[in-house]
């Protein structure tokens, strides 16, 4: 991975264009595209369905099965991009590695993309090779092994596929009657053919947070911690800065640096932690902008998306501070919608220091994030109230006209 692309940025839709190929075109990818276009970068969005959010703002788009190595290679060969940015896990990562050996820049690296999509690898790497503190865990690829792992760790446990995203296939076992159902849920939600699951000790944590970690040519820079809440393993609210002691913050930074150094490459990493009885515990890592980091659209002068592009291109990364305490809240629907329409946006935007992001997803299903509110205030509590109230103003329904 070369960090020197920023030494010469071309002109979009011309022979000298600097071209970014985005694999995965959801709401986070959309913000990456917008940040790239502010730097005059030509953008190409790829996903498995038409009218994905990032496609709506990119110069060009392709609809393919990104797990199909042949289809992926054809797009890359046709576009010959300067940079390839994977934004989701469901990609033919072996093909990415082959493309990288042929000279294409994959962010942060093809190997990091492959390894971090696998909870088994990243947990064993973090706990056993790097030596960071994690909760107790085990893996299983058959029911008998799974059942024994649950018994050994002890209920309550969290059960997840080793490969999935956004909480898919995740559930909590709080009593014996839920063991079978959790196994079936994890297997059904897996993005791999192995059907392997991870069984984790349920951490009754005091808080959870994300440390947005920027690896760049001059070293590693950390954003102020982002606190967050989740429901069914998926982001619901976040705020920045999240309160930590100096010791907790230092510990988290040391862990994040060790793990991201082991992965290599440049860009932003979302490193998740729990705090339990004052102890910082490593949870998960994503080698890309993080959903909880949507709050940085309002709280930082440079959002996580701006920082991601700067790090990738080899542009300067300044010290990162919170301009003003900020919060975000996700707009989540609870029913299937084929033509989503939004009302109440005017009411939400009448609130002080509130902004709205409607992601532009072409359809909805229960639990799908369709937008978010971001807010700032004199303190975290007020910012959280504003973001939550703004989301509550907005209603999503099928447009029957």
From Swiss-Prot:
Positions annotated to bind ATP: 119, 160, 165-170, 200-203, 208
Positions contributing to N(1)-(5-phospho-beta-D-ribosyl)glycinamide binding: 27-28, 87, 291, 361, 368-369
Family in the record: Belongs to the PurK/PurT family.
Record's protein name: Formate-dependent phosphoribosylglycinamide formyltransferase
Keyword presence, Hydrolase: no
PANTHER family per UniProt: FORMATE-DEPENDENT PHOSPHORIBOSYLGLYCINAMIDE FORMYLTRANSFERASE (PTHR43055:SF1)
Reactions this protein catalyses: N(1)-(5-phospho-beta-D-ribosyl)glycinamide + formate + ATP = N(2)-formyl-N(1)-(5-phospho-beta-D-ribosyl)glycinamide + ADP + phosphate + H(+)
NCBIfam families recorded: PRK09288.1, purT
Pathway: Purine metabolism; IMP biosynthesis via de novo pathway; N(2)-formyl-N(1)-(5-phospho-D-ribosyl)glycinamide from N(1)-(5-phospho-D-ribosyl)glycinamide (formate route): step 1/1
InterPro entries, A to Z: ATP-grasp, ATP-grasp_carboxylate-amine, ATP_grasp_subdomain_1, PreATP-grasp_dom_sf, PurT, PurT/PurK_preATP-grasp, PurT_C, Rudment_hybrid_motif
Highest rank taxon of the organism: Archaea
Subunit details: Homodimer.
EC number in record: 6.3.1.21
One Pfam family cited in the UniProt record for this chain: PurT_C
Any one cellular-component term (Gene Ontology): cytosol
Function: Involved in the de novo purine biosynthesis. Catalyzes the transfer of formate to 5-phospho-ribosyl-glycinamide (GAR), producing 5-phospho-ribosyl-N-formylglycinamide (FGAR). Formate is provided by PurU via hydrolysis of 10-formyl-tetrahydrofolate.
Organism placement in taxonomy: Archaea, Methanobacteriati, Methanobacteriota, Stenosarchaea group, Halobacteria
GO molecular function: ATP binding; magnesium ion binding; phosphoribosylglycinamide formyltransferase 2 activity; phosphoribosylglycinamide formyltransferase activity
Residues binding Mg(2+): 272, 284
GO terms for biological process, alphabetical: 'de novo' IMP biosynthetic process
Keywords linked to the UniProt accession: ATP-binding, Ligase, Magnesium, Metal-binding, Nucleotide-binding, Purine biosynthesis
Entry keyword NADP: no
Domain ATP-grasp, first and last residues per copy: 124-313
């Amino acid at each position: 991975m070369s960090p020197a692309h920023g030494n010469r940025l071309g002109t979009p839709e011309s022979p000298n264009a600097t071209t970014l190929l985005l694999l995965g075109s959801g709401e986070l990818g959309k913000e990456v595209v917008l940040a790239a276009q502010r730097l005059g970068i030509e953008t190409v969005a790829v996903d498995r369905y038409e009218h994905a959010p990032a496609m709506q703002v990119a110069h060009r788009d392709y609809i393919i099965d990104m797990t199909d190595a042949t289809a992926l290679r054809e797009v890359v060969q046709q576009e010959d991009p300067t940079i390839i940015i994977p934004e989701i896990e469901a990609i033919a990562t072996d093909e990415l590695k082959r493309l990288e050996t042929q000279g294409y820049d994959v962010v942060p690296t093809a190997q990091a993309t492959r390894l971090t999509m696998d909870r088994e690898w990243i947990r064993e790497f973090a706990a056993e090779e790097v030596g960071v503190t994690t909760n107790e865990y085990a893996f299983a690829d058959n029911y008998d092994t799974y059942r024994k792992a649950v018994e050994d760790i002890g209920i309550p446990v969290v059960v997840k596929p080793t490969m999935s995203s956004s909480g898919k296939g995740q559930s909590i076992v709080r009593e014996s009657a839920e063991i079978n159902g959790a196994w079936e849920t994890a297997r059904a939600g897996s993005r791999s053919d192995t059907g392997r699951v991870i069984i984790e000790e349920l951490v009754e944590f005091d808080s959870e947070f994300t440390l947005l970690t920027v690896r760049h040519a001059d070293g590693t820079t950390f954003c102020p911690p982002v606190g967050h809440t989740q429901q069914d393993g998926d982001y619901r609210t976040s705020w920045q800065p999240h309160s930590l002691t100096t010791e907790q913050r230092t510990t988290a930074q040391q862990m994040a640096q060790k793990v991201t150094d082991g992965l290599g490459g440049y860009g932003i990493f979302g490193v998740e932690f729990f705090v339990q009885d004052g102890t910082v515990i490593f949870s998960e890592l994503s080698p890309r902008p993080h959903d909880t980091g949507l709050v940085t659209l309002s709280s930082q002068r440079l959002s996580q998306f701006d920082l991601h592009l700067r790090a990738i291109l080899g542009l300067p990364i300044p010290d990162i501070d919170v301009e003003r305490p900020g919060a975000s809240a996700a707009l989540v629907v609870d029913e299937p919608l084929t033509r989503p329409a939004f009302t109440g946006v005017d009411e939400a935007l009448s609130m002080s220091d509130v902004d709205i992001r409607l992601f532009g997803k072409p359809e909805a299903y229960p639990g799908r994030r369709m937008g978010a509110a971001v807010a700032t205030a004199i303190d975290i509590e007020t910012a959280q109230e504003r973001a939550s109230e703004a989301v509550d103003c907005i209603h999503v329904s099928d447009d029957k006209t």
